[in-house]
């Protein structure tokens, strides 16, 4: 068989030529002398057509019939080398198809669990490693890739240097109650919830820096917008004002959206995303509204028949329904600026002349997607930062390096962070954040954690001593024994289902 191996997204350059594609059979149909193969290879999906007379003409009656029968018997997710002539096809969304001239099976696939019918979410998450192969899941990961690519491209063009912060940390960047703790050779350490504090040191050395990597939040939020492990881009910069920071954030988000439109148009089409809406978000300026003005606006409209948020007072933090209403009211991504200091991080710089408010901003995405960026100017005055830490009862010895940044040539500086999964969810137009990351880790009900995570762990650990109990009986017993510090974090991938905290199961 010919081995001019190309990928599906390259076929447009080989019209009229014979090529070979390594792919998986996503679906198959046909009858009689025709077999229609839906192929995928990670770059795209498209159709290959096998016609029996063509096989007989090339290989003879017996061998050609055998080849065609192989094509007709192909099962879902069988891997193949398919050789054929590339042809344009205006009827196809992809625009091309392959007239098959030869076919070779690489790896067979029998009884593939995710058939082309509807499946429940729990089933799909239990089979996440296979669900990733489906057309929509491939499209979401292609959009994720385009966003990551555009991130590096944007910061390179804007003079930022990639600066890697540690994942294990001895201090908290934000709320210490949202940290995963771990033992570090007898010392208490945390899984990073943000690289920001270290990035500030980088900004004092390099001017403009950004980081991109996994972060962890021990939030027990069971919403479509929360994960306990996700990927975050943090940026930090010296000598920029608050308004300049907002300009940079707006340009960044628009660059991400444009990057997806340019690099993954087929993915957007697969997901039936409203591309005109995305283009409008690029073309129109983002709205900027002060926190207090947003509260007043919410109060004025809370009696409207189309609102579904609870009453909110000045000084309260927004809930998801408030954020949704605000962004939908303006119809474009909206910065809410100058929140109360009472529920924001200790390092945020107060608004000049108004110490009750801080120079910060959350960017709220329209269409109900809520906050996608959080940023602020950092307190650059040593005495003011120490006073704030004392007010909050913080142990300054844990932040000596951070305070040093204010002692040796401090400058105005700020930064922002964006959870990549929230951005992917927004741009892709999907309903739940768990689809925006290959293997999501999120809070799950205790029952599902015990049954889907702990039971396989028990049976694999104690396989030489089989338990004469059902899963339900084991689950019932463990309810009385489960450790107090258990953080019930569920995940779709069995290997990572053992939790982040040290824990023990004690058997009576």
Swiss-Prot record:
Subunit and partners: Homodimer.
Name by which UniProt lists this protein: Asparagine--tRNA ligase
The keyword Ligase appears for this protein: yes
Gene that specifies this protein: asnS
Keyword Secreted on entry: no
Localization per Swiss-Prot or TrEMBL: Cytoplasm
One Pfam family recorded for the sequence: tRNA_anti-codon
Reaction catalysed by this enzyme: tRNA(Asn) + L-asparagine + ATP = L-asparaginyl-tRNA(Asn) + AMP + diphosphate + H(+)
Cited InterPro entries: Aa-tRNA-synt_II (IPR004364), aa-tRNA-synth_II (IPR006195), aa-tRNA-synth_II/BPL/LPL (IPR045864), Asn-tRNA-ligase (IPR004522), Asp/Asn-tRNA-synth_IIb (IPR002312), NA-bd_OB-fold (IPR012340), NA-bd_OB_tRNA (IPR004365)
Enzyme class name: ligase
Family, similarity comment: Belongs to the class-II aminoacyl-tRNA synthetase family.
Keyword annotations from UniProtKB, A to Z: Aminoacyl-tRNA synthetase, ATP-binding, Cytoplasm, Ligase, Nucleotide-binding, Protein biosynthesis
Enzyme Commission code(s) on record: 6.1.1.22
Molecular function GO labels: asparagine-tRNA ligase activity; ATP binding; catalytic activity, acting on a protein; nucleic acid binding; transferase activity
GO biological process, one term: asparaginyl-tRNA aminoacylation
Family annotation (PROSITE patterns): AA_TRNA_LIGASE_II
């Amino acid at each position: 068989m010919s081995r001019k191996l190309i990928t599906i997204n390259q076929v447009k350059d080989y019209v009229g030529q014979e090529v070979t594609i390594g792919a998986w059979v996503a679906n198959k149909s046909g009858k009689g002398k025709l077999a229609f193969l839906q192929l995928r290879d990670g770059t795209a999906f498209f159709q290959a057509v096998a016609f029996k007379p063509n096989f007989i003409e090339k290989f003879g009656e017996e061998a050609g019939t055998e080849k065609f029968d192989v094509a007709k018997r192909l099962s879902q997710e069988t891997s193949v080398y398919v050789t054929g002539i590339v042809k344009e096809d205006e009827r196809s969304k992809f625009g091309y198809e392959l007239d098959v001239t030869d076919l070779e099976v690489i790896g067979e696939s029998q009884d593939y669990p995710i058939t082309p019918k509807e499946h429940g979410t729990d089933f799909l998450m239990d089979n996440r490693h296979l669900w990733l192969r489906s057309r929509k899941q491939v499209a979401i990961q292609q959009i994720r890739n385009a966003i990551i690519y555009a991130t590096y491209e944007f910061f390179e063009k804007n003079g930022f240097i990639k600066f890697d912060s540690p994942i294990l940390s001895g201090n908290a960047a934000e709320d210490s109650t949202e940290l995963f703790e771990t033992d570090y050779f007898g010392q208490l350490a945390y899984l990073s919830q943000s690289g920001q504090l270290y990035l500030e040191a980088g900004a004092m050395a390099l001017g403009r820096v950004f980081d991109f990597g996994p972060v962890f939040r021990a939030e027990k939020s069971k919403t479509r917008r929360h994960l306990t492990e996700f990927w975050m881009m943090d940026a930090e910069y010296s000598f920029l004002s608050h308004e300049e920071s907002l300009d940079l954030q707006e340009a960044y988000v628009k660059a991400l959206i444009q990057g997806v439109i340019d690099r993954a148009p087929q993915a957007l089409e697969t997901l039936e995303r409203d591309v005109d809406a995305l283009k409008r978000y690029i073309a129109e300026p983002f709205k900027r509204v002060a926190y207090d003005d947003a509260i007043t606006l919410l109060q004025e409209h809370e009696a409207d028949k189309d609102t579904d948020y609870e009453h909110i007072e000045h000084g309260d933090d927004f809930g998801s329904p408030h954020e949704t209403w605000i962004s939908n009211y303006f119809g474009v991504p909206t910065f809410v600026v100058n929140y109360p200091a009472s529920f924001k991080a200790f390092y945020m710089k107060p608004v000049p002349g108004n110490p009750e408010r801080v120079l910060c901003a959350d960017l709220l995405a329209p269409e109900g997607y809520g906050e996608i960026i959080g940023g602020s100017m950092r307190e650059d005055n040593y005495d003011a930062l120490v006073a704030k830490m004392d007010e909050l009862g913080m142990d300054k010895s844990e932040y000596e390096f951070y305070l040093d940044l204010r002692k040796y040539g401090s400058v105005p500086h700020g930064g922002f962070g964006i959870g990549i999964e929230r951005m992917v969810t927004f741009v892709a137009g999907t309903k739940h954040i768990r689809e925006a990351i290959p293997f999501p880790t999120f809070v799950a009900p205790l029952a599902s954690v015990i049954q889907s995570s702990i039971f396989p762990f028990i049976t694999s650990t104690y396989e030489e001593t089989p338990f004469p109990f059902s899963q339900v009986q084991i689950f019932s017993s463990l309810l009385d024994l489960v450790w107090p510090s258990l953080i019930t974090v569920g995940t779709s991938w069995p290997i990572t289902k053992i939790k982040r905290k040290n824990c023990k199961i004690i058997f009576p």
